[in-house]
Amino acid sequence: MKRLGSVVLALVLTLTLLPGKVRAAGPEVAAKSAVLMDVETGTLLSEQNAHEPLAPASVTKVMTMLLIMEAIDSGKIGWEDTVTASEAAASKGGSQVYLKVGETMTVSDMVKSIAVSSANDCACAMAEHLAGSEAAFVEQMNTKAKELGMNDTNFVNCTGLDDDPQAASHRTSAYDIAIMSRELLKNHPDIKKYTTIWMDTVRGGAFGLSNTNKMVRFYDGCTGLKTGFTSGAGYCLSASAQREGLELIAVVMGSENSKDRFAACKSLLDYGFANFSLYTPALQEGASVPVKLGTAESVAAVPGGAVSLLVDKAQRGSLTAEIELAESVTAPVSRGQRLGTLTVKAGDQVISQVPLVAEREVVRLNILDLWKILLRRIAMAK
């Protein structure tokens, strides 16, 4: 192996400065629980009773939207498919667009109504459309929660309504809300086309929608995500925002009033943007390995996967990366074959090591090609 030297980190890395750790507590906010999480890496940047199971109200619909987006992105359903409202959907209380039994609406307008106006009737209609019944859909919600490691969560319905005795066990935590919010934003970014709408209409302009998340209008870079309120849950919010490539999720549960929940999320997001950065530099040009007996003389070495480095701004100047590559490699070389290592450091502390792999395949020269090369070298030696 050969060392190519230290370079200032300028590579899109998916690492965290303190992997698996929570930074020192951020601002204390007026809520029963709260968290601040980085979307790219999943790093928890601030917490306040993060794992306390509480009623989430309509923030539940983050999971509802996640399952809808999975169905759309997998091709199971399309944006222009029509959804028919059942009696169960039309009879949902709380926030709604007042669907009538038998009324049809496109998936796009259903999602818009859920994301912007927190429409319970549309959430139920989509649940039935995807799973056959709300109960079956709730099973899928809980299955997905387990897959994501949401260990504080038990869903009873797809809306977050707590007017049913069974809803007493409908619980999740601020941490789990951040987990599902991150999954939605990171892997299904098209949802932002809806969660960033301030005002819009459905039914051909006949019914107006106004976003319940006022941060969409008043917080710079806001990308969503979902409000919630019931008398039992209090005021809840999962708020996301992106600035200079860094996207954060702030979750608060159990605030006493709407003003407090927005102020709490603003405080958390402000703290995150003031103290953290996401680095995306490019690997030093010429990071390649010579290839013996190959159809190409060398192969470029690239990171073995998408990577991002979340750092404390106070340590920004101390970040370096050391690249170590093989002296050479013999063909055939497969795409993704390991060629070396990129070691990321903050001062003398090793933060993480990333494999460097072959960017493309290099085929081995055939016998005829080898003979031609040999004869050429003999001729040049005369």
Q: Predicted regions: what is each one?
A:
Residues 1-5, 56, 107, 367, ...:
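Structural motif marking the loop-to-transmembrane transition
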Residues 15-16, 74, 283:
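Residues in and immediately flanking transmembrane alpha helices
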